[in-house]
Each structure stands twice: as structure tokens, then as C-alpha cells.
Amino acid sequence: MKETLSGVVTRVTGASYIVETGDGLKVRCRTVPGTVSENEGSNLVAVGDRVEFRPKASETDMAEGVITRVEERRTALVRRREVRRNRSKEKEQVIVANIDQLVLITSFDDPPFNSRLVDRYLVFAESEKLPLLIVVNKIDLDEEGMVEEDLEVYRQLDCNICLVSAEDGRGIEELRELLRDRVSAFSGHSGVGKSTLINLLVGCEELRTAETSGKTGKGVHTTTSSAMFQLPGGGYVIDTPGIREFNLAGITRENLRFYYTEFLRYMPECTFSSCSHTVEPGCAVIAAVESGSIARERYESYLALLDSLAE
């Protein structure tokens, strides 16, 4: 029997997986019906997964192998998909695994800063106990510092924020330090400059880039598969496909309130322990919004997200 080796999945393209070993060997692998996984209820393999594989004869210049085991994931970035034939059932799609932090790439303009998207990612990061770094690109377009108005509410929440410009290089070194010696998953809508930033950080043109659609104002997707890249000086970044609608797996109408962290200090003062903070009398959260202790835009974001969640 051939020797079993271990490595980390650095790229997923369809049913093909690139696994990199500790000594830098890259092996193109596939799974088989007997592949063992420590993770149930989701796709078998994702970028960032630690796996065991068995080398096999290759007819190409690249080594090939068969994945025999997928180790248990310590963290995962999940997108939830509904099963078409029975919409009451859901299947988790793990986009990346075993990350140290989630990095949300936004932009000041083209497309404009989207606070509702930021709030969705904050909820997800809080639910998964993952640090979230908010990166605002294209600050070269913000000559008057207008983005600070959008960011003030997040600074009050002690969010990690980094302002950068892929165009003139501002903030890139600061961002590099925030990524050093960590496995960071880059996510966000297409068109914000995610691929351009990764190319700058990695030091070569690894990824295609695209402009924002003039018709919709939304990004044109250029990332179609996840991939992990090593950073000079330490650390890894994982590029993930643009997510137009980020689905919050595991978040319900009943538990959403616990992930708006500014609500927590007021919740014990509500008249009803199951208060949804919408219409109930004696709601301390609503009172805090009225007094200005909780930002109204965050509360309105909560209501909108609550309404979007299934009953």
C-alpha cells in the first residue's frame, strides 16, 4: 500500500482539489466513494481543509493523489443552499475551512459602501466566534473623508477597520500586518477590488479582476472558485467567490438579537424575556434606540434582517 501523506487544500475547482504538503509539494487530488470525512451535513472538501491523501501514478507533470480522509474543521465559512425539491430542507456549503479571521472587502464607491452587507457579516462572524476585519477599498475616491460617516457606528462597536487604496497603495502595509501569520478568508461583493488587493498582497498577478457593471452598479464576478495563497512574510489569504446574497446558516428570528452585541446590555431590562425588540411593551432595546444609546441605523438593519429570515 502506498504511503499516506497529509496537506491542506489550497484550491477547489469542481471535483478537483489542489493539496499542498508541508514541504511545498502540490498534488492534484480527487475524492472516492470511500473518502472519510469528520464533517457531516456539508460538502466533502473545501479550501482550507486538512486532509490525508494517497499518491497515485500521474500522466501529467503534476503529482496526483486520492483524498482518503478529511479532518474535522475548527472553523468554517458557510453558505446555505435550499434543496429545490423540498424547500424546507437546507444544505450547507462550506466555502472555506480552518480560518483565523474573516476579511470583508468593501469599497467607498463603485460600488458604494453597503452597511447592510457589513451588518450581515458582523452577525455571521459573531455567531461563529470569528474575528471580522472590515476593509474599505477605493479611499482614493473619497477626497472629503465621507466614508467616516458610514464607519462611525462600527468604530463605536470597536470593529477592526482598515482603509486602503489598491490604486495608490494607501493602507496596504497596514493591511499586510493585520494579515501576518494568520489564515484570512477574503469575502465580499464583486467589484470592490478584492482580487486586485490579493494580487498586491501576494506580489503577483494571481487573479483576474473586473470592473463594476454600469447597468446594475454591482460587481462582475471574476472569482469562480476558492483558492489559498501564501503571503510574503507569513500568513495565507483565501479568495472566495463573490456572494451576492450572504445566507446566515444557523441564524433564526429567535436568536438574531444575540448577535447584535450592542443589544446585550439592555436585553435583561426588557419586560419579556423572549422580547423580539420589535413591538413589545417595555422593550429596553427600543428605549435605547429612542434615547440614542443604540444607533438607529443598526436597529433598522436588525429589523430588516429579522424580516428576511424564514419564520
Curated annotation (Swiss-Prot):
- Binding of GTP occurs at 137-140, 188-196
One GO CC term, this protein: cytoplasm
Q: Name one GO molecular function term.
A: GTPase activity
Localization annotation: Cytoplasm
Cofactor(s) in the UniProt record: Zn(2+)
State the Gene3D superfamilies in the record: Nucleic acid-binding proteins (2.40.50.140), P-loop containing nucleotide triphosphate hydrolases (3.40.50.300), Probable gtpase engc, domain 3 (1.10.40.50)
The UniProt entry lists the main location of this chain as cytoplasm
Do you know which InterPro entries this protein is assigned to? G_CP_dom, NA-bd_OB-fold, P-loop_NTPase, Ribosome_biogen_GTPase_RsgA, RsgA_GTPase_dom
Assigned EC number:
3.6.1.-
Organism superkingdom: Bacteria
Specify the CP-type G domain's residue ranges.
88-246
Q: How is the cofactor bound?
A: Binds 1 zinc ion per subunit.
- Give the enzyme's main class according to its UniProt record, as a single word: hydrolase
Q: How does it assemble?
A: Monomer. Associates with 30S ribosomal subunit, binds 16S rRNA.
Q: What does this protein do?
A: One of several proteins that assist in the late maturation steps of the functional core of the 30S ribosomal subunit. Helps release RbfA from mature subunits. May play a role in the assembly of ribosomal proteins into the subunit. Circularly permuted GTPase that catalyzes slow GTP hydrolysis, GTPase activity is stimulated by the 30S ribosomal subunit.
Recorded protein name is Small ribosomal subunit biogenesis GTPase RsgA
Origin species:
Chlorobaculum tepidum (strain ATCC 49652 / DSM 12025 / NBRC 103806 / TLS) (Chlorobium tepidum)
